[in-house]
Amino acid sequence: MELQQLVPELEIRDLIVSLHKKEILHKINLTVYKGEMISLLGPSGCGKSTLLKTVAGLLEAQEGDVCIEGSSVLNMPTEKRGAVIVFQDLRLFPNLSVEGNIEFSLKLKGISRLQREQRVRELLEIVKLPGMQKRKINELSGGQMQRVALARALAA
C-alpha cells in the first residue's frame, strides 16, 4: 500500500502561530505518514520548536489545523493529544533513579505501584534500556539519558 493511501499520522494544514503579536509560523503545511522519519532543520529562531510545541498543545495556533491520525487536536486538552516533546534540556531529576524519573507522572495519575513497575519495564524495553530501573541518572551516558527522557514522555 502506498503512503499516500494511508491516513497521515500527523497532518498540519495552513498553521499560523503568533507569539507576542509577532507571527512566527505562517501557513505551515506538513504531512507525515506512519513509518516516516523527518527532520526539522533551520537556523535558531526560525520556528522549529514553536511548531512542535503547537502540535503538542503547549502553544495556541491562531489559524489552521493539526490532525493526529486523522483527528483534529487543536481543541483537545494537551494530555489527550497523543503528542509529547522531549526537550534538548532533558530536565531529568538527578536525585531519582531511572525508574523514579519515568514513573513520576504515573504517580501523579494515581496508578498503582504494581502497574507503575510494569509500565516502567515496558517503556525501558521500548527505548532499549531493559533492566536499568535502579540506575542513577549520573551513571548514564548522554544517549541513555535521552532515552530515559523519551520513556518519561511516553509515560505521561
Question: Whereabouts are the PLM-identified features?
Answer:
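Helix-to-loop junction immediately C-terminal to a conserved catalytic motif
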Residues: A56
